[in-house]
Amino acid sequence: MKRSLYTLIQKEDDTVDEVSRLQRNLALIRSCAGWTAAALAEKLGVKRQTISTIEQGENKYRMTRMQYLAIRKVLDDEIAASKDDTQMLYYVIDALVDHPENYTCEERTEILSKAQLLAPSIVKQPNQRKSASNAWKTILAASGVIVSAGLLAVLTRKKE
């Protein structure tokens, strides 16, 4: 029997650490950045197979803390360098990795499903990342999801 995204997220153990959450969502997150596994590997100075192994999940391989830190540095640098076209990436990381406790289960499910819908187009055409990010925000707003923690962070960032 196929389990829904809602069920999977609802049953997520709140004690799961950020390393595990990043590993679980890495394929989607790198797609939101517009990167293939090979592109992320190049940015990290590792082989594509290393990224593929990490993305296979914790049953086959558990990402190390050092790998987590390296991946986060690359992601955070990308967000800082391109704030206008990485909003979707920022919100996905915030909701699924950094602060899932700030979102309801329904909001996380909606964020995940909408990001999965748009992320493949970003990988195919990275120059369309900004328009995909804007479309993602519009879709979330239309579906009634309030990205409260993410919105607060963006508003705070603009004041700085």
In which residue ranges do the predicted regions lie?
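A short, Lys/Arg-rich alpha-helix, primarily the initiator
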Residues: 2-32
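Long, helix-rich, hydrophobic modules that act as membrane-proximal anchors or helical bundle/coiled-coil regulators
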Residues: 27, 34-36, 55-56
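Recognition helix of helix-turn-helix/homeodomain-like DNA-binding domains
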Residues: 45-63
